[in-house]
Amino acid sequence: MTLSDFQPVLGRPNIRPPHFASKVSYNASPQTSDECTRIALSFSTAKRKEPTDMIQLKENAGISMGILTAMAVIAGFTVANCYYNQPLLELIRADLHVSEAQANLITVITQIGYALGLFFIIPMGDLYSRRRIIMVNMLVAALMAVVIATAGHIAVVWGASLIIGACSVVPQIFIPIAGQFSEPANKSRNIGIVLSGLLTGILASRVVSGYVGNWLGWRPMFFIAAVLMVVCMGVTLMVLPDMKRNFEGRYAALMKSLWQIVCGHPRIRLNAARAGFAFGSMLAIWSCMAFHLAQPPFCAGSDKVGMLGLCGVAGAIAASRIGKYVHRFGVHRFSLCGGCLQILAWMVAYVFRDSYVGLISAVVIVDVGTQCLQLSNQSACIQELPQASNRANTLFMTTYFIGGSLGTFCAGIAWERGAWPAVCLVGVVFAAVSLALTLIDGWRRRA
């Protein structure tokens, strides 16, 4: 700091920015110099709000509720892109003049896209800037939503659905963030908060798209989805800090490490497999619900199908509560409970298939059962490999959505062959396989 930083004007010092120091130089009294130097230093050392991109979260040090809430909300809006189409399948089928099987493929392809995004995009969170990955994915998802809204052929919808599914994996970047940076005692709880936002988005997407489809048609829903993605991009820039990467190396080496994790961690394989079959069981009921309710005695429109999504709020509530008790009761017990609940749900769905009360009960039970399995097993995977949380979550969620895609695909074939009873059989089989894996694991551990 030099005396040239200050210029007396009308008997009072005028403080000039330091970058003018080299341009002006003149003499001043020592007293004036000391006083002005003190004032200038007070300006330079004043506490400033640290920019979001300079904030660094520390592992196990805690994460603010504001960031958690933002991640939960954005997770809900982003994952909704994968589920807007479910109540609209009948409208899309009629508008594009395709069969029910072709319309059902939209849901299947979206889930496949999500699985591809989980496998190829989520691991990048250990290698590159997570915030940048999130921004790019939301931008592409917004563009693909516009493509779907303007599509005139089913093949265009299929292609855009594949991409929008792959780019809607943002919540699966948020979940490892919550697991890695939360305090150890709050990890499962905070993962549950983000997961409850994700589930709320799934439920709300079905309700909103059902009503928008009933009143405005199916195309405006995807224009709305594009606008929501742009808003989420702005919120992400303002709220989410950047984070240090967890992996040093190239993308090829990163992907190779996935295979090493698969081979070296049998618990991750088990957790992912049983949760995947459970998710396939849950999606089986949703993938054919629009077709079932369009038949007598319901003859319901897309708005009624969307309203059923509200029944799944039990799953979101369960996710926000289960996290508190996973550490106490263990993953095995939650997996047993979830498998049994799913089988019970499908029995209700079959016996009371011509009743709204029966279908609502089945949806509630199957959602709660699924969340028992997902949250407990997903938390276990992330906590087993905290330094590779994105890759551990990649393996879990890729398997999870492969199971979901398989369940959706099998349910679609079953509907063509035997309508709702055949769909119920598919759901029971998937739930039974999940439960069997848990029982076999329990017997091996006791042996």
Set out the residue ranges of the language-model regions.
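Helix-loop-helix hairpin linking two adjacent transmembrane segments in secondary transporters
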Residues: 156, 193-240
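Helix-to-loop junctions at the C-terminal end of transmembrane segments
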Residues: 118-129, 317-331, 415
